[in-house]
Amino acid sequence: MFGYRSLLVLLVTLSLCLLLQSSHCSAVRTYGNDLDARARREIISLAARLIKLSMYGPEDDSFVKRNGGTADALYNLPDLEKIGKR
């Protein structure tokens, strides 16, 4: 009925389609966002503490204007206090 070659081509095509379908399903799978409100608040507060530590250091009264660890230096923001001064 079918020749050996056409049966082989049909099997290879079918296996390739199944392989592509299975890889497509696993790559597109969505993962649920399981962060509740408490975890989000904790992440935000920890990020705020990191920024505060980078700006002020361990003591609150020792403000360091610009060094390698301040947030504006990390994001490469310009020093706005030097603009306009001669």
Curated annotation (Swiss-Prot):
Keyword flag Signal: yes
Propeptide part(s) removed at maturation, as residue ranges: 28-64
Compartments (UniProt record): Secreted
Tissue expression per record: Expressed only in cerebral ganglion.
Q: Which residues carry this modification: Isoleucine amide?
A: 83
User: Where does the signal peptide begin and end?
Assistant: 1-27
Spell out the GO cellular component terms annotated for this protein, sorted alphabetically and separated by semicolons: extracellular region
Its primary localisation, in coarse terms, equals: secreted
Q: Which UniProt keywords apply?
A: Amidation, Cleavage on pair of basic residues, Secreted, Signal
Function of the protein: May function as a hormone and may play a neuromodulatory role.
List the protein's name.
Cerebrin prohormone
Which organism was this protein described from? Aplysia californica (California sea hare)
Q: What is the lineage of its organism?
A: Eukaryota, Metazoa, Spiralia, Lophotrochozoa, Mollusca
